Amino acid sequence: MVQKKSQVSKIITVEQIGSPIRKPKIQRLALKGLGLNKMHHRRVLEDTLCVRGMIAKVRHLVHVVSEN
């Protein structure tokens, strides 16, 4: 049997600080992909390249609260 290495994935907490009203559709979809839809809501996500890319697209609408 092949044993999988247990990886401790990093966690990132993101808070929405801006409204997606009158923003391009790609930015609204990035917020939806992050699981954010209302102001001041927070999500705890895995720190992956995909998540980092979505945060980069909406960096003016979100705030990274903590990185562990």
Curated annotation (Swiss-Prot):
Q: Does the keyword Ribosomal protein apply?
A: yes
User: What is one term from the GO cellular component aspect held by the record?
Assistant: large ribosomal subunit
Kindly state which keywords UniProt assigns to this record, in alphabetical order: Ribonucleoprotein, Ribosomal protein
User: A Gene Ontology MF term for this entry?
Assistant: structural constituent of ribosome
What domain of life does the native source organism fall in?
Bacteria
Gene Ontology biological process terms from the UniProt entry: translation
Entries under PROSITE patterns matching the protein: RIBOSOMAL_L30
Among InterPro entries, the record links this protein to: Ribo_uL30_ferredoxin-like_sf (IPR036919), Ribosomal_uL30_bac-type (IPR005996), Ribosomal_uL30_CS (IPR018038), Ribosomal_uL30_ferredoxin-like (IPR016082)
Which residue stretches, if any, does this entry annotate as coiled coil?
Answer: none
Statement: the UniProt record of this protein carries the keyword Ribosomal protein: yes
HAMAP family in the record: Ribosomal_uL30_B
Which NCBIfam families has this protein been placed in?
rpmD_bact
Indicate the quaternary assembly: Part of the 50S ribosomal subunit.
Q: Which family does it belong to?
A: Belongs to the universal ribosomal protein uL30 family.
Q: What is this protein called?
A: Large ribosomal subunit protein uL30
Coding gene? rpmD
